[in-house]
Amino acid sequence: MNFTAIDFETANSSRSSACSLGLVQVRDGIVTAEHVWLIDPRQRFDGMNIAIHGITPSMVQGQPTFEELWSTVEPLLQGEVVVAHNAAFDMSVLRYCLDASGNSYPDFQYLCTYLLGKKMLDELPSHKLNVISQHFGISLKHHDALDDARAAALILLKLMEQDQKCEPLLLADNQGYTAGKMFAGGYTPFKSPPKKAPRKKQPAKAPAFPPSAPSVKPYF
């Protein structure tokens, strides 16, 4: 049960505008380390984003840029199983920030608790982080990067317990998902295998009359 959960917050709609990163390490099913950083994105802050996470331009003044922070974060992700809620977003933020700073991608596999929750908790009206957290009784200050990362970690532990799987990758495989991968030069998404298209039925052939049969007019 070893994995690392992450969550990014952004200053605006650009995926390269990370302004906070939360990271939670789990070893043998127990949270063993938590980290949170404010990041100076060197970009504008949109009012809508500030309203969501509460991070303002003045709060990131003097904080490291992503490029400056990366040497600290990279060893915490390299070779890990990484987990995020709506991983498509967080992984795209990571890729965009790495591209913008000229850094190569680390090597790790990743899972998405949003998609796993959607598959395993289909009775819930929504599978947003706050809804699944409430379902499992997990305390959450939503859109705080550390709280969101911690909630994703605890949700994964609950899902593994529910599925009686002791490893994240076994859980994903058992639910029909392939782990996403990030590697030098590229990535693959966390996804379920494509559904096979149903075989088309061949149209039934009309029975042929014996050669000696008389012509018959159809009756409707």
What are these regions (language model features)?
Residues 109-112, 171:
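Beta-strand segments within the central parallel beta-sheet cores of soluble alpha/beta enzyme folds
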Residues 1-108, 122-123, 127-143:
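Conserved non-catalytic scaffold segment of RNase H-like nuclease domains
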Residues 157-220:
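Acidic two-metal-ion nuclease catalytic site recognized across multiple nuclease folds
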Residues 111-122:
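Short, flexible loop segments at boundaries between secondary-structure elements
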Residues 145-159:
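Acidic, divalent-metal-coordinating active-site segment for phosphoryl/phosphodiester hydrolysis
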